[in-house]
């Protein structure tokens, strides 16, 4: 069921929407329960795009009714196994960010400068949830090596100076349209910054 059909069904067939979400939730929870039983699995990566540039794809009320209860149970299962959950979600989640944190997500990935720069995310929520990535994909894909280095350093100065709660990385999933030299520049600048900021460590 695509977004358009889902949106109509929310009005015309709410029982169908509830049944679909319940079944998807059951399958997801069963998969996650098996995954966290494996010793080598230390974290669950939940990729679930909830938003677009201006807000959530559906209203927060819809998410609270149909989606968040399954998130809550998933997080309970993973945390009971002593493991972590990273949420990867694109879009503007400002209206639901506090709720996602209260549900218990350990980390959040996928940030875009034109929506909300990662520095602002870290300033507002970095004391409650780990922030991963944030070097904007547009800079990585179209910027020069120097621009990538400058942006990487700016992100680190704002988000990593305390040494906790932030992990350097791309703003979204690494893609084959990022020039290799730009990706390497981001990593190299991160290592340089760490050596300068935390001398005597292996970071």
Where are these regions (language model features)?
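Active-site loop segments of alpha/beta catalytic cores
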Residues: 1-203
